Swiss-Prot record:
Domain notes: The presence of a 'disulfide through disulfide knot' structurally defines this protein as a knottin.
UniProt keyword Repeat present: no
Organism: Oldenlandia affinis
Full protein name: Kalata-B10
Keywords per UniProt: Disulfide bond, Knottin, Plant defense
Pfam families reported in the protein's UniProt record: Cyclotide
Its job: Probably participates in a plant defense mechanism.
Length: 30
C-alpha cells in the first residue's frame, strides 16, 4: 500500500511520501 521509493534525489529531496535521500542519490523508505 505504501508508495514505492526509488526516484533520484540529486537535490537532496524526495517527492514520494515517507521516503528519504539518506542513500543519495536514490530515495529509500524512511
Amino acid at each position: 500500500g505504501l508508495p514505492t521509493c526509488g526516484e533520484t534525489c540529486f537535490g537532496g529531496t524526495c517527492n514520494t511520501p515517507g521516503c528519504s535521500c539518506s542513500s543519495w542519490p536514490i530515495c529509500t523508505r524512511d
